Amino acid sequence: MKISLVTDAWLPQVNGVVTTLVELGRELRAAGHQVQVIEPGQFRTRSCPGYAGIDLAIAPAKGLADKLDAFQPDAIHLATEGPLGWAGRRYCLRRGLAFTTAFHTKFPEIVNAAIRVPLRLGYAVMRHFHAPSSGVMVPTPSVLEMLRWRGFRNLREWTHGVDTELFAFRETAGDYPGLEEAARPIALFVGRVSYEKNIEAFLRVDLPGTKVVCGVGPVEAQLKERHPHVRWIGLLPRATLAQLYAAADVFVFPSRADTFGLVMAEAMACGTPVAAYPVDGPLTVLARRREEDGSSDARLGGAMHEDLQTACFAALAVPRHEARQRSLDFSWTQAASLFASFLVPAHGRGAPGSSPAVVTQMS
């Protein structure tokens, strides 16, 4: 099948959405699909206000149309709600083409945290964007229910994966250059240093040992000034990041706005247990859904609590092999197969529920 993936999030950006889409493309190609990626690097761009390192395409409509016309995809997926996503939406609607979309990021929460735009308005814009979609892919059951409550339709639960070979298991926390003499336990955060990540909740927690932050972002300078005793690592290549994960005793995920939180699965793959709030992402990554035998919601690979300090101390007691075992539940091969089953034929606007069978015939 020829699949066009339209995304505003792509390399060299460093975030969970980019990692998800890169891994998705790799798995789809390995399964025999032809994948066209339309991303900002193919257009004139400008930096996203307040988010250095994230470039947005300028007036991409014609260039995007030319690329789609030349490729003639069997299925079109709009991965993000940025300029390219909106241009792809217009392209499809004007030509009567079916398409799918994804809800990777809680943009309403991000703009609310940054500039106080009301959540109601933010979700109205998102609902309008996704309304014509034949299938809106969401990463967790709780996000699906939240969007359904907010009036979104055609929702599809789609999970993510983790590269368990790159992020290899360590039975005991290892050393990382510059942290060999750091006091234990080492508590680690990895991610964009921005408003919505709620990093200060982690930095304010009273914990023994050493706190480490890996990432860059718009609030980095002010957090460094307020928390001079924290170790700030900056951006790392993924192979080096795996070494840092493995060196930590606990991975702290303070965000309340992430839809999934891929970094949690990566940390657990290295054997590092996770501490988090019991909110959307962690509830899926750290807890298995109720089984028929009643063994539901077991905390696997970490701990959740509304008191982040309590979660941290509980996570430190989780054996590293349990964290690794939970990470093995997240497979990129399985995620790509599920993604392909949700795609719809671009030239056939049948009921979304019938699309998986059609896609199978086209594969």
Label each region the model flagged:
Residues 98-100, 109-128:
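Nucleotide-sugar donor phosphate/pyrophosphate-binding loop at the beta->alpha transition
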Residues 220-239:
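Nucleotide-activated donor-binding/catalytic signature segment of Leloir-type glycosyltransferases, i.e.
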Residues 256:
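Aromatic "clamp/platform" in nucleotide-sugar-dependent glycosyltransferases that forms part
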Residues 273-278, 283, 287:
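Short hydrophobic beta-strand element within catalytic cores of glycosyltransferases
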